[in-house]
């Protein structure tokens, strides 16, 4: 067993890179990828691609993600969360009714400017490093999609509201929280952020790590998720010996399937062989996998 998924739950207070480093040390010499960085102050689902599964990680990066986050109204911080320095204050706190009603304004495709404290690169340097050094960071606005946004709870005494968001890749929840507050004629920052789902990987099925000292290779491998799991809803064709050989060597391979398909996968003897597209019966591989039964 050397290629699979691990649905790990990242706790608050550790970076995504540090968590990957710990898992890699436990598993030994194996390639590991993940579906998108979670802030140090955030927690939640961080699916890890092990071995050949790294060839599919872009699918998870592109997948919908869901978050639950709490906004504290009345202040703005330089980082957009509780770890930053307060840079602005207002006495105006939005009403419960408005905190709920504002959600509909954000559903759909919207423009968002990533926060200065982000992992995006500016001239080869991470934006957050420039921001920490007090340098001005200019990031270009980008289009993102909010599929669903709703207020789950409003705490008048503490001036907070908790929201659920289902969104596209590239969405920054800290920026969404700030924009929500601004639309409510107030200021706000994130005090709690939890990613609850990435594609098929859900919070309730994630691996909780109480102590990193207790992790073993066996305990992780026992909770592996098959590499094909994220392909379950996608067309699959079974290859015979001749077709499999051609695909492995990058040769033209024909299938008895009349429809053109933009994205599909090929299985050989029950195992993932390749992903790609089908045009006029001809399979064009995007990625070929080196897996055994």
Curated annotation (Swiss-Prot):
Catalytic activities: uridine(55) in tRNA = pseudouridine(55) in tRNA
InterPro entries: PsdUridine_synth_cat_dom_sf (IPR020103), PsdUridine_synth_N (IPR002501), tRNA_psdUridine_synth_TruB (IPR014780), TruB_C (IPR032819)
Pfam families the record matches: TruB_C_2 (PF16198), TruB_N (PF01509)
Keyword Repeat on entry: no
GO biological process entries: mRNA pseudouridine synthesis; tRNA pseudouridine synthesis
Keywords from the named record: Isomerase, tRNA processing
Ribosomal protein in keyword set: no
Enzyme Commission code(s) on record: 5.4.99.25
Broad EC category: isomerase
GO molecular function terms listed in the Swiss-Prot or TrEMBL record: RNA binding; tRNA pseudouridine(55) synthase activity
HAMAP family (UniProt xref): TruB_bact
Function of the molecule: Responsible for synthesis of pseudouridine from uracil-55 in the psi GC loop of transfer RNAs.
Protein name according to UniProt: tRNA pseudouridine synthase B
Organism taxonomic ancestry: Bacteria, Pseudomonadati, Pseudomonadota, Alphaproteobacteria, Rickettsiales
